[in-house]
């Protein structure tokens, strides 16, 4: 039995061993593949997308993610929930918000995956909301479990929304109630792809780069 699970030191070596069993490769080929796989892990240096020059708080990161998601989807603004701990909510808490901060260091795709509400491969959602609906959501937060204990939204916008005007909103955290009241659209834009492009446009990022103007 040759295990060829996801581990990146085993997958390709496992397949090469299967080739050996089938007579399509030599043992030297298997050893060479194993050496290459081990080297790729031990000496792997992920690409640095940008460099953060000072600690960015959870809210700072939410502001940057909001700009990124809004611009990537052609939205007017963004509502980004924060993954704070709320007593009484299920232990899963909020998987659709910004949950961490960024420290002063080179930023890789792994660092982005930690702060992105979409993780590695989920897509960005958008929704059409009036300014009044936006204000209501800011007051109530993302009510993930329908119990009135909402996770706070951060409004990311170049202008203050007008109550009677309708906006396209990139949103991170859609409650069942909101999904029933409004049309939520899958933009088809993968959050990680958008983030790599957005953050990669900066050689360095500091708090001075957060404002959307």
Language-model features: locations:
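Catalytic centers of hydrolytic enzymes
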Residues: 1-213
